[in-house]
């Protein structure tokens, strides 16, 4: 049996972050965020579509597991900042304390987020997605509704809101069968 030769994979050059300067490290994040006892500590990530430039920004609150999803028209940091500010600005300022992100170029508008939302932004170490484990788990749940080959250009905002609602009303084992919305209401009174 003769095997066909495989085409070589094209690799992107590593993006340079030296010009950005020092980013606030996850090591400096308040310990309350790690303990998941206090409302107001968020993690975010970008879910990419292979079919188009459209992406979905996933944001989750660590203590309650509440999910916020938003559609990004492209992968720029301006668009990422817009979606995060749009989705979190409806919360009272006392519920906005920290946001933990990865070091992707789409997340470099962090100073604008700090100013707009009055919260502190921290960055996980490079290639350490487990430092934002809650959010990586959330992305897996979102992928159940929007598999890898989903073209986000064809997904409506209404469909994204529906998935957000389904995830927020889904009972979680870690909360003893309570939903994230129930936990949020309990913790906020």
Locations of regions flagged by a protein language model:
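Short, surface-exposed connector motifs at secondary-structure boundaries
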Residues: 64-68, 91-96, 145-146
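Active-site beta-loop-alpha junctions of metal-dependent nucleic acid enzymes
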Residues: 49-52, 69-93
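Glycine-centered loop/turn motifs
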Residues: 36, 40, 149-150
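Basic, flexible linker segments flanking DNA-binding modules
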Residues: 1-34
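Short conserved beta-strand segments at catalytic cores or DNA/RNA-binding microdomains
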Residues: 47, 51-68
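Acidic/histidine-rich, metal-coordinating catalytic segments
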Residues: 94-109, 127
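Charged alpha-helix within mobile-element recombinases
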Residues: 104, 113-189
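Two-metal-ion RNase H-like nuclease active-site motif
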Residues: 39-49
């Amino acid at each position: 049996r003769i095997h066909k030769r495989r085409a070589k994979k094209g690799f992107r050059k590593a993006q340079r972050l030296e010009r950005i300067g020092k980013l606030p490290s996850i090591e400096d994040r308040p310990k309350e965020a790690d303990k998941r006892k206090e409302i107001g500590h968020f993690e975010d990530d970008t879910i990419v579509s292979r079919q188009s430039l459209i992406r979905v920004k996933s944001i989750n609150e660590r203590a309650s597991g509440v999910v916020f999803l938003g559609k990004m028209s492209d992968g720029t940091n301006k668009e990422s900042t817009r979606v995060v500010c749009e989705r979190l600005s409806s919360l009272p300022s006392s519920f906005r304390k920290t946001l933990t992100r990865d070091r992707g170029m789409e997340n470099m508008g962090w100073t604008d987020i700090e100013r707009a939302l009055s919260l502190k932004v921290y960055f996980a170490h490079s290639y350490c997605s487990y430092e934002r484990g809650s959010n990586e788990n959330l992305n897996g749940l979102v992928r159940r509704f929007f598999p890898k080959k989903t073209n986000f250009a064809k997904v409506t905002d209404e469909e994204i809101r529906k998935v957000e609602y389904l995830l927020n009303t889904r009972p979680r084992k870690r909360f003893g069968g309570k939903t994230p919305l129930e936990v949020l209401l309990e913790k906020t009174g």
